[in-house]
């Protein structure tokens, strides 16, 4: 038989069809249509009791990502993308977050923490507006928040070395998601946190503050978006380093996210994705602290330094 003879027509058709299916599956992520940005629906407003502050939203499997008119559409879609990457394969956590009326709120570069309706009762306002460019959700305040400048890596982002959404959404997964679907999770987390502290792990670092921050900092490293070593962080900033340094925390996180291989990369390295095509950070506003919050920041620094001296 001549191996170079033309294949029968039906065989050629099946081969071409198989190749087309493979190409379609391979390129599914890059060609997928992304959720449209639209005003919150009347049903969503009623169900989540949303404030009129929110004029835009994107839905991720029914979970709302919200912003005011000042927030860019691409920021909403970027947040939706990151949330979906983190929770791939965990539809049950989506359901728990929606049932608990959790929502994700984005601050524009010239908006601040206490402008988010769920956080508007935090006082003193200047303290919180300078203290945080993102907060986790609690039953009393069911909004996870983050600044647009961090989502899109805009100029002036004070947290440019890490992704704040991953950290704050990790808190929501813990407190508003897993708390509803796994009654043993918090106790398990507390136990491995206690063991880590007893062994001297994370000594003097932000992850040592409590089991909530231990979890959120671990999730950041698991997804490859933690800070380089500084006064609040040690060398653990990747999945491999986390597995080596604190294997118990790694194992729990890996169990929750079911071995999710996704790793965070900055948006400028993902321009092929539908929501980032044609996007340019230079077209958007940069971030800067207003003068009154710079003064507040200096005061908070002095207070921390004084407290450290008193605790010596």
Residue ranges of predicted features:
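An amphipathic alpha-helical core segment
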Residues: 186-245
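Pan-zinc metallopeptidase signature
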Residues: 219-312
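N-terminal secretory signal peptides that target proteins for export/translocation
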Residues: 1-12
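Acidic/His-rich structured neighborhood in mature extracellular/periplasmic domains
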Residues: 45, 51-53, 60-63, 71-200, ...
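A structural signal for well-ordered alpha-helical segments within the folded catalytic domains
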Residues: 77, 81, 163-167, 210-221, ...
